Amino acid sequence: MNSHTKQKIGVFGLGKTGISVYEELQNKYDVIVYDDLKANRDIFEELYSKTAIAALSDSRWQNLDTIVLSPGIPLTHEIVNIAKSFNIPITSDIDLLFAKSKNLKFIAITGTNGKSTTTALISHILNSSGLDYPVAGNIGVSALQAKASKDGYVLELSSFQLDLVKTFTAKIAVLLNITPDHLDRHQDMTCYIAAKSKIFDRMDQESYAVINIDNDYCREVFIKLQQEQRIKLIPFSVAQILENGISVVDDKISANFCDDISFELQHNSESFRQDEFQGEPAEPECIKIREHRQDLQNSLVSSFMHYAVPFNKNLQGVHNCENIAASYAVAKIIGVEPKKILESISSFQSLPHRMQYIGSINNISFYNDSKATNAISAVQSIKALDNIYWLAGGIPKEGGIEEIKPYFSHIKKAYFYGQAKEIFANTAKNIVDFVICDNLEQAFDLAYKDAVGDNAEIKNILLAPSCSSYDQFKNFEERGELFIKLCSILSLRGLITGSS
């Protein structure tokens, strides 16, 4: 968009993204807005101007230069049909940020699970090294609300956001994993994979694609990009030691990066130093990776650099090993020394509601994984722990908890609540001991009482609902906050100690 011309812009969707777009554009363009939800329109009217609100029946929507669409709006919506009928280009807040920050470097992360943790971890590593890479996107900070940066941005991008980008081009793009999700929006897996793959659009030989080749769908994307030969490819794995790439296997990070793969950036932060790490760091306590493929390669290429994975309660489990592998790869491409990467992994504080360690009492540890809104996501935290008192429930997703059945051996007892309680109970019947509860509070209380009576050395109370939250909560955040509050009550009684 040309800021020298008073163009006419439509902003459709008035959630966090739409509001940030309006604030960015209102003084530069003639802007009209709309949202299907009256509550959002009412909030906008209170904050800004009623005159900017225009229903889709208003002819002004047919005479716009551009429409900025929020990612929550499906491409089957009437507004998209209007845009097509009147040849109005559709753009997004991601493209707007890119347009005004083209001199900066963009690191983009997508995947079905693990996006937020990886986005935050990469930002933490880079910022701890003296760089300036704030997070934005699907992580809770909309693109246009991100703080100004000197070096670049780390963006979490959902499939909905990727469907909308037209000009955004990442310098480094990460594909963590792909499992069936959002098929109500994307119709089928082919469309879903195509949406995820858009993160690599417009990238070239000066760009890097970091891809998890353990995942079948991701490996297909990797092979396709390999055939195209237009992007530098960095594979990563937690199942095998790669001859060229990043692996996190047997408590070790193994990196085989040739000298010519280093990423040449113009760093604006004066405190950044690309020192070569000399020697292998002391071996800290390591994350235990329980599962590897039988065909695991035991031999290391002589040129590998390999380091112990620093133990961090907030980064447990195979899924977090994937997040660590991807983050290490990105930081290595940028030029951060291995010692600094490992220190940053060790000091990383997890995002709320994502396998968040709350604290412990008498060998009972409390973990909040409220973000685990489906079984595939919950599997990751369940695999990471043993002797689990599992809190699960809400509005069930298709397939229920069938994906978790192979890992029921990790669960000591389950506490089911919400709309899913009977469905989950039928799946667990005769396999796992369980209790049906009215709500999360009751489930928490019963789990705590049972864990106190357990003489085992290690006990874990885990909230991994495997469901959406809308039957009893506004969102997964509110659900997770209640779990934290229940833990805090124990803390006030002097029971829980040492959350980190």
From Swiss-Prot:
GO cellular component: cytoplasm
E.C. numbers: 6.3.2.9
GO MF terms held by the record: ATP binding; tetrahydrofolylpolyglutamate synthase activity; UDP-N-acetylmuramoylalanine-D-glutamate ligase activity
Entry keyword set: ATP-binding, Cell cycle, Cell division, Cell shape, Cell wall biogenesis/degradation, Cytoplasm, Ligase, Nucleotide-binding, Peptidoglycan synthesis
UniProt KW Ligase keyword: yes
Binding, ATP: 111-117
UniProt catalytic activity: UDP-N-acetyl-alpha-D-muramoyl-L-alanine + D-glutamate + ATP = UDP-N-acetyl-alpha-D-muramoyl-L-alanyl-D-glutamate + ADP + phosphate + H(+)
Entries under Gene3D superfamilies matching the protein: Mur ligase, C-terminal domain (3.90.190.20), Mur-like, catalytic domain (3.40.1190.10), NAD(P)-binding Rossmann-like Domain (3.40.50.720)
GO biological process entries: cell division; cell wall organization; peptidoglycan biosynthetic process; regulation of cell shape
Pathway stated in the Swiss-Prot or TrEMBL entry: Cell wall biogenesis; peptidoglycan biosynthesis
Keyword Cell cycle part of the UniProt annotation: yes
Localisation: Cytoplasm
Function description: Cell wall formation. Catalyzes the addition of glutamate to the nucleotide precursor UDP-N-acetylmuramoyl-L-alanine (UMA).
Cited PANTHER family: UDP-N-ACETYLMURAMOYLALANINE--D-GLUTAMATE LIGASE
Similarity section: Belongs to the MurCDEF family.
Protein name per its UniProtKB record: UDP-N-acetylmuramoylalanine--D-glutamate ligase
